[in-house]
Structures are given as C-alpha cells and as structure tokens.
A protein has these predicted regions:
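Low-complexity intrinsically disordered tracts that form flexible linkers/tails across taxa
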Residues: 267-280, 677-683, 844, 919
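Outer-membrane beta-barrel transmembrane strand signature
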Residues: 52, 157-209, 218-220, 224, ...
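Conserved small-residue
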Residues: 106-181, 542-545, 550-556, 655-773, ...
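Extracytoplasmic gating/loop element in the C-terminal half of outer-membrane beta-barrel translocons
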Residues: 360-363, 372, 801-906
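Extracellular/periplasmic, surface-exposed regions of secreted and cell-surface proteins
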Residues: 46-47, 245-264, 300-355, 366-369, ...
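Short, small/polar-rich motifs associated with maturation and membrane association
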Residues: 1-243, 255-257, 323-324, 359, ...
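Glycine-rich phosphate/pyrophosphate-binding loops
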Residues: 14, 216, 789-809
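Short Gly/aromatic-enriched secondary-structure transition segments
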Residues: 122-123, 355-358, 431-435, 680, ...
Length: 950
C-alpha cells in the first residue's frame, strides 16, 4: 500500500474506507467516514477529523513507519472534547517518540511490483464484428450491416495468419486515412493496450531515537516512489518525509515538547489522464479491436485518444507541507496539570499542465491537427495552452486546558476545562495562456496568446470552550459529562455560537462482588451508554450567509457581447443568489449503547455496540421560489438524517508452546434514512446548479434505494413476446428505438392498474417502478489470522462487504456510454463495445453463431435501450471478500547478527489484493462500482523488503 488509509481498510468496525470514482489513480486516496453517511452533500461535509499528535493533518501524507498508534472516536460523547470539527468522529494518530536509553537506528525498505486487478478482455475481432452486425440487424435496419462481408473475410484471414496487413493498404477511410475502425482488420485488446503494465514502486525509511532522563528525541526520513500502470506514457508519484520530535523535562513541574514535519509530494502524469481520468475506460473501451495500433506508414492509426495520451502534454503537481508544534505541561500542584499547545501547518501546492497540438497522419504522411475529446473550445484542433496554479494554505491552532484529579476513599474525580482556537487561510491563483511556442518547455512565459487569470482568498476561524467531569467509584461505576460552547466565523450574529452537551455512564459488572465466581472466565464485562450532541460548521461555502456577485472579464464565448455587434464588453456582472442570514449550525446527536468484554485471562476480547445518530438542521435546498425573483433559492437548515447501526469486534490471542497465534474479526452495519427534506412530491430526480439531473431525496427515503422494474424474464419466442406486449404495452418506456419487440427481449412486470408499462417520476406515483435494491454497503467485515514460530511469522488480512446491490448499466438520465462495460451494445454504435461476457446474449435457433435460448443478456439492439431499463434481473450483487494482504516474514536469530552489531533483522514477502471472491460481473471490480466501472483500476501487488534495527 502507498497510503495509511489503504492499510486501515477493514481493520476496525465503523471506520469505512472506500475507493471513490477516481479508482486507483496515483493522485487520489480512498474516502473515509465513520459509521456511514453523515449528510447528503447538499452544502456541508461529514468527513471525520484527523488529528496527528493533536493537530489536524492528512493521514495519507504520513510515513507509516512513523506511526505509533491509531485510535478512532466514533460517537459524540467521545468526540466532545474536540468540538465543532469532530461531529462525525475523530481519527487520532500518535507518532513515535524517543525513549530513554542508547540510540536506536532502524532502517526498512519495500520493493513492490503491481498490476491491474481487473481488466476485462475484448472479444476478438471476428466475434466483435458478428456481435455488432447482429445488433444492427436487430434494430430493424434490414441487411445494412456495420461490418461488410469483405471486412469480416479479411479479419478471419488476418487472425489465421493468411493476410499480412492490419488494414487494406489500398483502402481509405475518412479524409484520406488508412482504414481505422469498421473497415480495418487488426485484432487488438484495447483496454489492455492502454493499461496493463507491471509498475514498480519502492520505499525506504530511516530513523534514530533515544535520549536520557531529561531529553528524548526521535528523527526519521522516508522516500516513496510509485509508478503508474499505463502503457505508452509515464505516471509517477514520489513522496519525501522528514520528521523530528523532542521532549524535555525542564524541571520536576515543567516539560516541553517540539514536533516538526516536512512532506513533499510530486505527481506526474499525462494531461489526458488529468483531464479525462474519470472517463478513461469510457473512451478507451469505445475503440474497436480491428482498429490497428499502427498504420502502414508506422504512425499511430487515426486514434486521437492514443495521440493525446502520448504527446498531448504533461501534468505536474507538487505539494510541500510544513508542520510545527510546540507544547508545555505544568504540574504546579499534586493532581493539577496545565497544558498548552500551538501548531502551525502550511501547505504550498503547485500544479501545471499543458495541452499540445495533436496530429493524425494521412495515407500520404501528411499531419492533420485533431481536436481533443469533449468539444471544449479550448481543446479544439490546433489549440495549445498552459495552465499554472498555485495555492497557499495555512492553519494555526492553539489549545490551553487544565485538569485536576482527586481521589477520596474509593471515589475518583477528574475535572478538565479549557479552550481552543483555529484559524484557516487559503490563497489561490490560476493563470492560463494560449499559443505555446515551445511545447518542450511549456510555461506562461513561453506562450504568446491571450491570458486568463483568476484568484481567490478565503478564511475561517473557530473558537471553543469546554469542560469535562469524570467520576468513577472503584472502577465499577463510571460517569462522564461534557459541555462545549463553540463559535464560528461562518455564521452571523446570534447564529454564530452554539452549546453542545454530552454525557456517558458505565457499569463494570466484572468488578461486582457477585461476579467473583465467574471472574476466572470473564474478567471484563462493562456496560456503557452515552448521549452527545455536537455542532457541524463545515459548510462547503466559507461565507454562506453573504451574497457574492461574480464579476468576470467579458468574452464572446462567455456571452459577454453588446446587442448591436460582437465587440466584447469590458466586464460582466451577474446577480448574486439569495442567501439566508439564519443559516446556522448543523446539530449531530448520537445515542450509544455498548458492552465490552474480556475472557480467559484476556485471551478473548471484544465489544458489541448499537448506535443512533441524528443529523439535524443540515444545510439543504429551500423549496422552489417563483422565477420572477430572478435568483436561485437560498440554502437553509432544513434537512435531517437518522443513521442506525451496530458494530461487533472479537480478538483472540494465545500461545501453544513455541507457537503464537492470533485472530480477529469485526462486523458492522448501518442504514440511513432521510427524516426531513423539502420535497413533498417525492420526485426521484432534481437539477443541480449546473443543470445536471441528480438524485433527489424525500422524507422516509432510505439512502441507497434503487428504483427499477421487476423483470419477468426474456421471451424465448416471438409468439411469447407478442402475447406479452398485447397485454402489457411496453412502447412507453424511454429510449425504445424503433419499438420492435421479438424473441430475446425483456418482459417487464406490470405493478399498477394501467396496462402500459411506464416509468414514474416520483415515489408517490412510481407507476411500474419499485424498490429493487440498495447500493449502501451492508455488513462490512474484516478478519485477520496470524501465527509465529521460531522467528517465522505469517499474517493474513481479509476484508469485504456481505451485502450490496449496484446498478452499473446506466439509465435514461446518463449518456449511453455509462452502461457500456456492462451491456456491451449500449444504444448507439459509437457508445458500445464487446467483451467476452457479452457473448452470452440471446440467439434464436438457426443463428450462425449458435443458438443461446437460456442466455444471460437479452438480444442486443443498436439504437435502442428497450432491454436495458433499470431492472431486477441485471441488478448486480456487489458483495465481495478480498485478501487485502498476506505477509510472510522471518526474523534472523540473534546469534547470526550479533557479530554485525545488529539488534534485529527481519525479511518479509507481502502480497496485496491477491484474491477476490464475488458474484459480480467479471467486467467489474466490486470496489470500483462508481462511474459504472470506468475508473482507473486498482492493483494487486507483490513486494519484499527488510527491517533492520541496530
């Protein structure tokens, strides 16, 4: 693994780590949440707070070898002391410190080789052509086929080694190009052509620690390098870490500590991946296998995607993070402690990418400028530009608190009170200039065209006061109460401050006298209950209660023109949207009940926990207002969620003679329901600010619901299909093309009184739609096994999801290409493909490819989605179990290494993502269901290394 979050996946219940729509790209990390969805992404964030040695930081930028401990606070009562930044939990990371004694030097390395976990194979060119021709015939086009008999004959001869050319050397297609798709005859596997490389990575770590009774120190440095998996172009990620920590006991009553870290991260990749990484497979999969890699002159065939990848430009980004922290600890009186800490974190981010001209070559070796994907005018044929971005951020935090401990008889008290402040500032500048004169040295200064420049500066601050009381009686009865008073710069006046209480109680039953007979078997049995409330000020707008008027430089492209001619206006001002001055804190309240237990002298340990979390007054959309107002409705505190869930963790550790072994298992589940949302009609979809159709919410909706049709089956004969549609009119379904229904088509269930099969627009009038599944991951689990014997050790880690439904076939809201990897033929000819799985499609008796009456897929149809409605038959079971890691190590006997003055030497071999069990379509990785399987793939990895201590 190359990040801490990857290593944490499946380790503890309730800490959910998922791959996002970026997949395995080098410039992204997995997403994290604690106990499921916290909000609806309608205006605020529900990410957990990550504290590294008491200060917020990026867990994925840390050197894993510097980490001493990671703990997770999940409920509001446990997180109360951390206030307004922690309503959705806290991840506490403690880095290593020095210990008194002689200096200890440690060195470790890791060399790894990675390949993609799942790249589906395309059909060979012959079957691909037959598959597409069958789909064209099914559309009702008669005898007009996509691939001619002559082309298919050349394909067969080429595959048999009887034809030497990948396309007809005398043929021509388009504007005097060699044949490049439907008229060519190569046999390529394009997904593997683009991304199927064994990539190399390495990691090196060096640390020294030690000290005396007064001063202790820890210093470390690390280097990580990881290459990408893409062919034809290089990708790389490099990270450099330097850290130091010093603690000093100045007097008996005063100690000081200082902590500093520097992190440098460099990422390089093709501009093509930076711009189109989210649709990478959507574009590469559209290439036909008969399309040659090279034309007869040795150039890349007319393939803009390949040219953009290899020569379209480069993206380079770097990020420098500086972190410093200083603290003191006073103990002026017995039981009294006074603690203070101040931290400063600054980040400097730089990113530059350039777009070069892309050329294709004719039969006569003449270059022709080609446009990039997407129709962006900035990426038109012949356009070049360079864009440079700089971003400076700084965060300053302070905390000061005192605690006092006092015991009287068997009563123990602890009182804590203090305050903390945070200040965050970000400044960003983006410059763009066209017409680069030297593509080998792209920069703003080596471009001569027009320039675009924009920038921004933003800031926010928080302040909080807190108090905590802890009480326990003989370790049997426990009580804790917290109160916080938090303020934020994001809200106005009376809405700026909020008060948030929490309380927890516990009963250690194993400490009771009546439990003594069972203590030899169960030595820990503790019940605990908690209630807590925290505020969330993490809105996606730093100034959510202020109207902002956009003023931009006018241009014809932006619509900034005068009425009577095309002259540019000097600038354009747009009216600001409405805002609510009453916008205030989201309130996150949790209820928690748990049981901790330990048995058999703590060989068996575990806990079980049940929780409810209410997220109230979330920032959401206001109800629609009349268009006469001339502005969008303001966001308000008008939505709420309730999450219910439970967690279980079990661990066992023991030794039998010289064999030590351990096992752990964790399981968790959570479901979230919308309890308040301004959508009384319960419409399925709405529009976002950019006009895109997105999922809508309503009161009573469970997050993750998948609405679709119930599938009756595939008609085996024309008579069966005609009999069905005579009673159940399916012509009103969206995107049915020529509305031709035959054997091999889907029969949809009629769920209402209307004889027509129709798609409703709301949960109040769904027509024939019903809930067919839920994409929320259910029953997340992880379990590990390990053993050691005479220096040998082995550890295995499994992780997975026991229940999850996903729909990866697209729908009528999305472009045809969204369902291409699942369906193959997916509407239009140029938004379709053919993989091995797609050959399991319905074919009647007498079909030249052989009959297949019990096929999985319906008959394919070019230009129609009639068989590809969201439906129960093709809902995918995305449950999976994955061997996340296996590691085998051997620690050399001390007798072998003492002469070299070595304390410990361990060799290891490791593998990541080596096996996956799932019932999902083989075209998909069950962890990458976003973008309908079109994300950058994950990788499986083999690695080896050594750990040395001296």
């Amino acid at each position: 693994v190359t990040s801490v979050s990857q290593a944490l996946q499946g380790v503890m219940p309730g800490l959910n780590i998922d791959m996002n729509d970026k997949g395995g790209r080098l410039d992204y990390n997995p997403t994290m949440n604690i106990r499921g969805t916290g909000n609806l992404n309608t205006g605020s964030s529900a990410s957990p707070l990550v504290l590294i040695d008491g200060a917020e930081g990026d867990i994925n930028s840390l050197n894993p070898q510097d980490i001493a401990n990671i703990s997770v606070l999940k409920d509001a009562a446990a997180s109360a002391i951390y206030g307004s930044r922690a309503p959705f939990g806290v991840i506490l990371v403690t880095t290593k410190s020095g210990e008194a004694g002689k200096a200890t030097i440690q060195y470790s390395n890791n060399f790894r080789w990675s390949r993609p976990t799942n790249i589906p194979d395309m059909l060979d060119s012959y079957r691909f052509a037959k598959y597409f021709n069958a789909a064209q015939k099914n559309s009702g086009s008669g005898t007009t086929f996509i691939f001619t008999d002559d082309t298919i004959d050349r394909i067969q001869k080429y595959m048999a080694g009887e034809y030497p050319y990948t396309s007809d050397p005398n043929g021509s297609q388009g504007n005097n190009f060699f044949p490049f798709n439907v008229a060519s005859n190569d046999n390529q596997n394009w997904p593997r052509n683009f991304i199927d490389k064994t990539s190399f990575g390495q990691e090196h770590n060096l640390s020294i620690s030690g000290g005396g009774e007064k001063v202790k120190y820890y210093l470390s440095g690390a280097f990580l390098s990881q290459d990408g998996q893409m062919n034809y172009s290089d990708e790389s990620k490099k990270r450099y870490n330097i850290s130091g920590k010093v603690t000093g006991q100045v007097t008996k009553w005063l100690s000081l500590d200082f902590n500093a870290r520097f992190i440098r991260s460099d990422i390089e990749m093709p501009t093509f991946v930076k711009l189109y990484g989210d649709r990478f497979f959507a574009e590469t999969t559209k290439l036909y296998p008969m399309m040659p890699l090279y034309d007869n002159n040795g150039h890349y065939t007319r393939n803009p995607k390949l040219m953009q990848l290899t020569s379209g430009g480069r993206s380079n980004s770097s990020k420098d993070t500086y972190f410093t922290s200083g603290g003191f600890h006073l103990t002026p009186l017995k039981g009294l402690g006074i603690h203070g800490q101040a931290t400063l974190r600054t980040e400097s981010y730089r990113h530059q990418y350039n777009v070069n001209k892309v050329y294709l070559y004719t039969r006569d070796n003449q270059p022709v400028e080609e446009a990039w994907l997407g129709g962006d005018p900035d990426l038109a044929a012949g356009k070049t530009f360079v864009q440079s971005q700089t971003q400076q951020t700084s965060m300053m935090t302070t905390s000061l608190y005192a605690d006092y401990e006092y015991s009287w008889n068997k009563h123990n008290f602890k009182v804590t009170a203090g305050m903390n402040t945070e200040y965050y500032y970000i400044n960003e500048l983006i410059g763009k200039r066209y017409d680069v004169i030297n593509e080998n040295v792209p920069s703003i200064n080596t471009a001569t065209g027009t320039s675009d420049l924009k920038g921004s500066s933003k800031e926010w601050a928080t302040m909080g006061y807190f108090a905590r009381l802890n009480y326990d009686y003989e370790g049997r009865y426990l009580l804790e109460g917290n109160i916080r008073r938090d303020g934020t710069s994001r809200f106005r006046g009376n809405q700026r401050w909020g008060t948030f209480p929490s309380v927890s109680i516990g009963w250690n039953i194993a400490r009771e006298a009546f439990w003594s007979p069972a203590e030899a078997y169960v030595n820990l049995l503790k019940l605990r209950f908690s209630y807590g409330s925290l505020g969330n000020q993490n809105t996606d707008n730093y100034y959510p209660t202020y109207s902002i008027q956009n003023i931009t430089v006018g241009s014809v492209d932006a619509g900034g023109r005068w009425l009577l001619d095309l002259a540019n206006k000097s600038n354009i001002a747009s009216s600001p949207g409405l805002v609510s001055s009453l916008l205030t804190w989201e309130r996150v309240t949790s209820y928690n009940a748990g049981l901790d237990f330990g048995a058999f002298n703590n060989r068996l340990n575990g806990y079980v926990e049940y929780y409810i979390r209410d997220t109230k007054d979330m920032v959401g959309p206001a109800e629609e207002i009349t268009p006469l107002v001339g502005a969008s409705a303001p966001k308000m505190n008008n939505t709420s969620l309730r999450t219910k869930g439970w967690e279980l963790q079990l661990t066992w550790q023991d030794r039998i003679g010289k064999v030590g072994y351990h096992a752990s298992f964790n399981l968790s589940d959570a479901q979230t329901e919308v309890t308040e949302y301004p959508n009384p009609d319960k419409t399925f979809y709405t529009k976002d600010g950019d006009g895109n159709t997105i999922e809508n919410y309503w009161k009573g909706k469970k997050l993750g619901e998948i609405w679709g049709f119930k599938t009756v089956g595939i008609a085996k004969t024309d008579e069966e299909m005609q009999s069905w549609i005579a009673q159940h009119d399916q012509s009103k379904l969206p995107n049915v093309g020529n509305n031709i229904w035959k054997a091999g088509d889907i029969m949809y269930a009629n769920l209402d009184d209307n004889p027509a099969i129709e798609k409703g627009t709301s949960a109040t009038d769904p027509k024939d739609l019903t809930i067919i599944g839920n994409y929320t991951p259910r029953f997340r689990f992880g379990f590990s096994l390990g053993a050691d014997y005479k220096g040998f050790d082995i550890n295995l880690m499994f992780q997975g999801v026991a229940k999850r439904d996903v729909w990866v076939g697209g729908d009528d809201r999305t472009a045809y290409s969204k369902g291409m990897i699942f369906w193959g033929i997916n509407g239009g000819q140029w938004d379709s493909t053919g993989y091995e799985e797609h050959m399991d499609y319905f074919r009647p008796e007498g079909d030249e490819m052989g009959a297949n009456l019990n096929a999985y897929y319906p008959r394919p149809i070019i230009g129609s989605k009639q068989n590809q409605q969201v439906q129960s038959r093709y809902l995918q079971n995305a449950a999976y179990i994955r061997l996340k890691n296996i590691q085998i190590g051997y620690t050399l006997p001390k007798a072998w290494i003492q002469k070299a003055n070595l304390e410990k030497v361990r060799l290891f071999f490791s593998g990541d993502n080596l096996w996956t069990g799932t019932k999902m379509s083989k075209n998909f990785d069950p962890e990458l269901i976003y973008q309908n399987g079109m994300s950058y793939p994950l990788s499986y990895t083999l690695s080896c290394g050594i750990n040395i201590t001296l």
